[in-house]
Design a protein with these regions (language model features):
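Conserved NTPase motor "head" modules and their coupling/switch loops across ABC/AAA+ ATPases, GTPases
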Residues: 1-31, 171-312, 321-325, 329-332, ...
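Conserved P-loop NTP-binding catalytic core
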Residues: 11, 15-96, 145, 153, ...
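Nucleotide-state sensing region of NTPase/ATPase domains
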Residues: 47-130, 134-146, 203-208, 240, ...
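Structural recognition of the conserved hydrophobic beta-strand(s) that form the central parallel beta-sheet
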Residues: 72, 338-345
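Conserved beta-strand scaffold positions in the cores of enzyme catalytic domains, especially
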Residues: 113-115, 339, 357-359
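Long, charged N-terminal accessory/stalk domains
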Residues: 122-124, 129-178, 182-185
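Short regulatory helix/loop adjacent to the ATP-binding pocket of P-loop NTPases
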Residues: 137, 347-360
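Walker B catalytic acidic pair
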Residues: 316-318
Length: 366
């Protein structure tokens, strides 16, 4: 799985720019604010249909441009394919694969990416939302139905939250509360099943990677956490649904009093431990960074197991945040697939990986 060629027209600070990539490692270097991350963002969008930096499509359209276009020649599942994303202000984005219209959730059938940026180094110490986002981004690429369930859940959650906040001023809103509670339980049940399965696989893949780096003295653990009333997160969606309904009904008064949704998949988390101790509370910065690296590299292995191909790995200015030992650990494990690395200086990365070098300056790629 790889991108051979990309055209960027009116995208961010790229007017009309093209780039050819090596099937292995590609080192993209240049000073800050020149467009390196914009280039990685365009590749991310080809797989996800959205950005990892903004929710607003209008921000992709370059100054003075009416539209932005990303056009790429990719090789996936043994086939050459063309992926195109067209963005216009005020108009829904257009996505096509080989000129056939696609939804954002369908892009994962053609292209997969794993993004690793400096914020991910804090994955262990951040709140649960960061770890849910990790699960959501990964699962939605290999299980398109998951993205549909996630979209449904978010709509039910937002609607119910508004009711819980405003019902005192508009008591009639409570007439629809049960409808949204039911929808939350149904979509949550599906998300919980997918997440529990993914978390188990992530734990199996990450532990040996972590052990390889840290030695046998440290054991990485990953456990999935969800609503306490869910007896078995790997059970059928129907069983989980009933557990959630019971929990939600028991907390109905508390939800009305607090104005918050107290039951559902938005309560999920991944509990990361090192030698049995909660890493968020007790691990050092070095330990949490090693754990985060192991988790991201494990995510890559899961894609390989699922699709038979490595996803495209995007390392956005992350190597500069790592010491030499951790840099080598990452670089030694990225073989077998295509990798795009951004950095301010090449610093011998291309020599150590045998990769292609691209220089970015003022929105030009050379």
């Amino acid at each position: 799985m790889r991108i051979n060629h990309i055209d960027l027209n009116g995208f961010r600070n790229y007017d009309f720019e093209t780039a050819d990539f090596s099937p292995g490692t590609n080192v993209i270097y240049g000073e800050n604010a020149q467009g390196k991350t914009n280039l990685l963002e365009s590749v991310y969008m080809l797989a996800m249909g959205r950005s990892f930096r903004t929710r607003f499509d209008k921000e992709f359209i370059g100054f003075g441009c009416d539209s932005a276009e990303i056009l790429a020649d990719v090789v996936s599942h043994g086939r050459e394919q063309t992926v195109r994303i067209l963005l216009r202000s005020g108009v829904r984005k257009q996505i096509t694969v080989n000129s056939v219209k696609k939804t954002a959730s369908e892009l994962g059938e053609t292209l997969n990416v794993v993004l690793f940026c400096p914020d991910d180094l804090n994955l262990i110490k951040e709140g649960a939302a960061a770890r849910r986002r990790l699960m959501d981004n990964a699962i939605s690429q290999i299980r398109p139905r998951y993205a549909e369930y996630l979209s449904q859940f978010n709509k039910f959650y937002e609607s119910k939250t508004r009711i819980l906040k405003d019902w005192r001023e508009k008591p009639s809103l409570l007439d629809t509360l049960d409808e949204f509670s039911d929808g939350m339980c149904r979509s949550s049940a599906q998300l919980i099943r997918y997440r529990a399965s993914f978390a188990a696989r992530l734990a199996d893949e990450a532990a040996p990677i972590h052990s390889e780096f840290s030695g046998a003295d440290e054991k990485l653990g990953i456990e999935y956490s969800t609503v306490s009333a869910v007896k078995d997160p790997t059970a059928s969606a129907k069983e989980i649904f009933y557990d959630l309904c019971d929990h939600m009904e028991a907390h109905r008064r508390a939800e009305l009093d607090s104005g918050q949704c107290l039951s559902g998949a938005h309560k999920d988390d991944l509990i990361i431990s090192i030698n049995g101790k909660n890493a968020r509370s007790f691990a050092s910065q070095g330990q949490t960074r090693t754990a985060a690296l192991s988790i991201k590299l494990a995510e890559r292995e899961i894609y390989l197991d699922e699709t038979g191909e490595y996803p495209i790995l995007l390392l956005d200015d992350v190597l500069s945040e790592l010491d030499t030992k951790r840099q080598e650990f990452v670089l030694n494990r990225i073989g077998g697939g295509q990798t795009l690395i951004t950095c301010c200086e090449d610093e011998g990365i291309s020599r150590r990986t045998g990769g292609k070098v691209l220089h970015v300056a003022n929105g030009r790629i050379g």
